[in-house]
Amino acid sequence: VGAGDLFLFFGWFKEAELVDCNYCFKSDALEHHRIFGWMFIDQKLNVGSDTEEFRRKFTKYANHPHATGKWGPNNTIYLAPETFSLFGEHTIKGFGNFSVSKRTLLTNDNAPSKRFWSVPDWLNPAKGGCIPSYHDEKNYIGGLLKTAGRGQEFVCHPRQTKKFKGWLLELFNEEINKPNPTQKCETRN
């Protein structure tokens, strides 16, 4: 992983609603995995295990969580640019959050557990796609990916550039064209 790569972040969520200027989980909402954000890598800073030395050299990042405490030799900080060019077609913020949409949903309602995800074709080897790290073809059952119980991230190198590019462009087009709703709450004293 290095400069020019793109992180897509996923997590476990439950829908919330704003009630009297406080967010509360909706009682009838289903929990689900979804892709929630992105970060384009502009720079990779190898912090290593000597965080004190790193903080002396890079004072700008001294308060970053990976610049304090005890870490192993692979400890790394990734930096995003202000913007990047997505396939030369759009200028996108270097990092951000995706809106909730069907395209970002990974959980399959009919799956036996939350570990089974519906994934795009570029991430499905039966459709010519790539296999994420910590997985192999045995993890694909009935068209779903049974995710590994380990790791908080998976790495993959899309082989179907055309399908991946199309999927990613559609995902970012949703972001570019989304309305920007605002809701105001009064400050309490």
Identify the role of each PLM range.
Residues 31-36, 44-189:
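Contiguous surface segments at macromolecular interaction interfaces
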